[in-house]
Amino acid sequence: MVVIEGIKYACERCIRGHRVSSCTHTQQPLIRIKPKGRPATQCLHCREARKNKALHVKCKCGSSSSKHAATCPCYSGGGCICTNKHPQVLPPNSTTTGANGCIVINKAVLDEGSQQQAQQAQQQSQSQQAQQQQQQPQPQASPILQQPQMPTPVHTTNVTTPPVATPTHSHRALSTTPSLSPQPQSPHSPESALKSVNFLGRTNSSSSLSSLHSGRNKNRIEKVRPSHNSLSAASQLANSPSSPFYAVTPPAWVDSPTLVPTGALDASYLQILNDDLSSPLLDSDVFSSLDMEPVAHSNNNHGGIPTGGSRALASTDINFDRFESTSPSSILSSWNLWGGVGGSDAPEMSVAANPSASASASSIQTPPSSNATPEWVQGQQQPCSVSPADVMLPFKRDDQESVFLTEPLYL
């Protein structure tokens, strides 16, 4: 309910529902609330004459003989015209407007006064802020700034510095910034060597660490793409006397000891990784790039390090995408891994041990001596270090990329 100049207004729905006291619908058209009791007559002359609030039903003053005929607004042709039927005959000084004695107001009429007050308050605040800014004194300049600056003496020297070329790209500028590490690492330190080339021949060591630590499932699949530059750099490091790769012990994060040879990381092991993974293999070319020689004891075998059979067949060296057959027997027969019954002519993969690695051979956890018969040879006809249970059925991928198993799967 809205009160304007002592007159109450409410919406039509609240008036019909007798809820005028709780009406807050200011966004809808508002209608004047009539006072309690019978409404006053719409005829001003009759209302003033009778001095009551009775409903004007019929006017008897409209006769021509009446003394009020000239001044009665409802007189027209000898009859009474009620304001409910003809609202246009209302006098201009009437207190009510409209056919039913009600007025209709909008929200704009109600907000007009509040908007004017808000504008006046805003103007006053702006004027006060302007006066305060004018009254505030301007800050004086400090005496230090007012003092004349003394010219700095220029010392001429005969030494000329070469111009520094500014980098054109942002990534070059980032690469030229000095390192924040307090102790720089030497290029031959084990930490830098492990960061540059890891045991699998890849240049990004963080990717191998994340791939080994991220998945807890042991049947992990990883795509191995060794680059030629990283392999050549690793082979040069392995052949040098001061190489940190002599007698490398597998770190703690390596799950299987077959991923790293027990001897030195020499060119023979790198040649295995550098094999062309995209060309298809024939039946007799499976181990063409490897050093195929029978199990023998060399004279350079110091510290119990065997030269032949020192490295078991890692599952990362077999590309299952090269074979189209899905039978394990056909794969074993085509690989020719199991040899004859006696096992004397069975080929064996070996990595040539570096003679200079014998100095640190005492710190290497070596397998049993080659003079004794290994446990996997006793009572079996397969002299190879890979058993038929270690061979997984080959599978194909839609992307036709080389897929390797980082750990052997057992059937």
From Swiss-Prot:
Look up the record and give one Gene Ontology term from the biological process aspect: positive regulation of transcription by RNA polymerase II
**Keywords of this protein's UniProt record, alphabetized?**
Copper, DNA-binding, Metal-binding, Nucleus, Transcription, Transcription regulation, Zinc
**This protein's record includes keyword Metal-binding:** yes
Give a Pfam family name: Copper-fist
Q: Which GO terms describe its cellular component?
A: nucleus
Q: Where is the composition biased (Low complexity)?
A: 115-190, 205-214, 227-241, 350-370
Annotated localization? Nucleus
Q: What is its main location?
A: nucleus
Residues that, per the record, bind Zn(2+): 11, 14, 23, 25
Q: Where is this region: Disordered?
A: 115-241, 348-389
Q: Which residues bind DNA?
A: 1-40
An annotated Gene Ontology molecular function: copper ion binding
Against Gene3D superfamilies, the record matches this protein to: Copper fist DNA-binding domain
What does the UniProt function comment say about this protein? Answer: Transcriptional regulator involved in resistance to high copper concentration.
Please identify the protein, giving its name as recorded: Copper resistance protein CRF1
The record lists the organism as: Yarrowia lipolytica (strain CLIB 122 / E 150) (Yeast)
Upper lineage is:
Eukaryota, Fungi, Dikarya, Ascomycota, Saccharomycotina
